[in-house]
């Protein structure tokens, strides 16, 4: 995996904190109607309701281009999202690969533990398959498709890692920024049509986090390996 994604500045940290004062207009989408997993908690559920409603409100506003889209038709739990990253800078190699193969977006799965927001979200690429780091690829995506960067871990004695104040909008933008990095650039794999699976994604996350000495959140291997 490439070097760490650039740190969030103090000004950016202020911008990624929850914006409870934002007025959300009523829409047909009501996240409270979604079923909850047995391990859900009140704290995580309320935070996720708020986060998701803010994102849906913005993505339903034509003037807003978030650069990503939460697929509501595939949202079967507030604790598990499918997100499309789109509208990459057309000059970067990843965007050029995508255009060449008529790939419209990078599709992610985002999963949340019952300890969220005290623990970070777990994010992995579903499709398309990206070129491995050992073969010249980049973008902070492991060989198994998981996104592994300091922001999505508990850090270590030198790196702070996750902050509970981070919003999911800011996190997804950071993931897109990492995929847009040119050092080295993310590229589509030769076998790009083959989807990643959950087991290889978690195995890749563990290997990469251990390599950097980052602390893996507890219970992730049992929660997200399937």
Give residue ranges: language-model regions.
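UBC/E2-like fold recognition across ubiquitin and ubiquitin-like conjugation systems
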Residues: 1-104, 115-226
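Extended lipid/amphipathic-ligand handling interfaces
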Residues: 108
């Amino acid at each position: 995996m490439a070097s760490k994604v650039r740190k969030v500045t103090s000004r950016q940290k202020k911008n990624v904190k929850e914006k409870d004062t934002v007025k959300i207009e009523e829409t047909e989408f009501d996240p409270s109607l979604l079923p909850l997993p047995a391990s859900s908690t009140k704290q995580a559920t309320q935070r996720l309701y708020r986060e998701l409603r803010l994102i849906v409100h913005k993505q339903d506003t034509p003037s807003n281009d978030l650069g990503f889209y939460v697929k509501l038709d595939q949202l079967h739990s507030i604790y598990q999202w499918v997100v499309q990253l789109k509208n990459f800078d057309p000059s970067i190699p990843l965007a050029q690969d995508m255009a060449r193969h008529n790939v419209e977006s990078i599709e992610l799965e985002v999963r949340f533990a019952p300890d969220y927001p005290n623990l970070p979200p777990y994010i992995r690429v579903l499709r398309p398959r990206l070129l491995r780091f050992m073969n010249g690829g980049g973008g902070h995506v492991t060989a198994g498709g998981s996104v592994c960067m300091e922001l999505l871990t508990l850090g270590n004695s030198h790196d702070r890692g996750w902050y509970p104040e981070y919003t999911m909008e800011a996190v997804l933008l950071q993931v897109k920024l990492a995929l847009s990095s040119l050092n080295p650039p993310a590229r589509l794999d030769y076998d790009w049509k083959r989807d990643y699976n959950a087991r290889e994604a978690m195995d890749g996350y563990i290997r990469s986090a251990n390599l950097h000495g980052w602390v893996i959140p507890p219970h992730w291997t049992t929660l997200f390996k399937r």
